[in-house]
């Protein structure tokens, strides 16, 4: 049998405008995903809200579907770019891609018989609830400490039966799907990345909770909810306070993660006038905060 391959093509951008140009060209040529990586040793720390700064030299990599013809794609790129950008190509065998991902992503238990696992993994625990996730378009598999802490809270401490939840910055949809599986009656999800909403919908269907999930392309479409979960960065958490408050009632709870320990004070400065703020978990320098109205 002939081995099938994914195709990775990488181009180097010298400035932010080139990054956007190359990303657009790769997507127009059929890339199913585009990622950025440093082409040197330069580091970028947390950017200002509303900005996406790049390295001085940025590798822009497109991942193309199985059995893509590299020569045809490169020809399309050259036509679109109008100049000769060096292109590095790499063929990734389908089996290697799947095997590498499965080796990296092992089943994770979060207590209360709840697991996150790939479709290929077998969970033998009796009465287990298993949230199935596979390689996809958006971030969020439960391996990062901030996501893991959110999941642990939803599974063990949130008492979600019959409640409404807003998963703000949903990524793969993992948190909202977990809430639905733990008994929430309605879960609203939003994200600034349209691919995240696509991934959330597909994952909700896979986990048979799609009837409870409501995707909001516009954040304002969600109503007031019992629990708002936001696993995003410090600056958006601070900047979005007014937006979050549109979706709260007097007894609502907010759960924030995506924060480092050293950032808690700044978050408190943005919320402490009207909210009681509790640190309820900490892992590997990341924290989970619970906010309730004073």
UniProtKB/Swiss-Prot annotation:
It is found in: Cytoplasm. Its main location: cytoplasm. One of its GO terms (cellular component) is cytoplasm. It comes from Dichelobacter nodosus (strain VCS1703A). Keywords: Cytoplasm, Methyltransferase, S-adenosyl-L-methionine, Transferase. S-adenosyl-L-methionine binds at residues 147, 169, 191, 231. GO terms for molecular function: protein-lysine N-methyltransferase activity. It holds the Pfam family PrmA. This is Ribosomal protein L11 methyltransferase. It comes from the Bacteria. PANTHER family: ELECTRON TRANSFER FLAVOPROTEIN BETA SUBUNIT LYSINE METHYLTRANSFERASE. The lineage of its organism: Bacteria, Pseudomonadati, Pseudomonadota, Gammaproteobacteria, Cardiobacteriales. Methylates ribosomal protein L11. GO terms for biological process: methylation. Its EC number is 2.1.1.-. It catalyses: L-lysyl-[protein] + 3 S-adenosyl-L-methionine = N(6),N(6),N(6)-trimethyl-L-lysyl-[protein] + 3 S-adenosyl-L-homocysteine + 3 H(+). CDD domains: AdoMet_MTases. Belongs to the methyltransferase superfamily. PrmA family.
């Amino acid at each position: 049998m002939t081995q099938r391959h994914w195709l990775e093509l990488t181009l180097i951008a010298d400035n932010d405008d080139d990054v956007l140009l190359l990303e657009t060209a790769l997507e127009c040529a059929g890339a199913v995903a585009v990622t950025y990586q440093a082409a040197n040793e330069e580091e970028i720390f947390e950017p200002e809200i509303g900005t996406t700064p790049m390295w001085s030299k940025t590798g822009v990599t497109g991942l193309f579907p199985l059995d893509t013809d590299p020569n045809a794609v490169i020809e399309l790129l050259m036509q679109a770019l109008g100049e000769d950008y060096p292109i590095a190509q790499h063929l990734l065998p389908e089996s290697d891609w799947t095997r590498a991902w499965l080796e990296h992503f092992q089943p994770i238990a979060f207590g209360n018989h709840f697991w996150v696992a790939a479709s290929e993994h077998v969970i033998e625990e009796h009465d287990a609830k298993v949230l199935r996730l596979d390689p996809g378009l958006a971030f969020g598999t439960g391996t990062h400490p901030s996501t893991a802490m959110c999941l642990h809270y939803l599974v063990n401490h949130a008492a979600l039966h019959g409640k409404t939840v807003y998963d703000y910055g949903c990524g793969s949809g993992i948190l909202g799907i977990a809430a639905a599986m733990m008994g929430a009656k309605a879960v609203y999800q939003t994200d600034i990345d349209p691919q995240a909403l696509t991934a959330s919908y597909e994952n909700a269907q896979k986990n048979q909770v799609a009837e409870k999930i409501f995707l909001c392309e516009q954040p304002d479409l969600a109503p007031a909810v019992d629990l708002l979960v936001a696993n995003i960065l410090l600056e958006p958490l601070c900047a979005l306070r007014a937006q979050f408050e549109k979706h709260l009632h007097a007894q609502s709870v907010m759960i924030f993660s995506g924060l480092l320990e050293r950032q808690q004070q700044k978050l408190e400065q943005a919320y402490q006038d009207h909210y009681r703020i509790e640190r309820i978990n900490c892992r590997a320098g990341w924290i989970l905060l619970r906010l309730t109205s004073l």
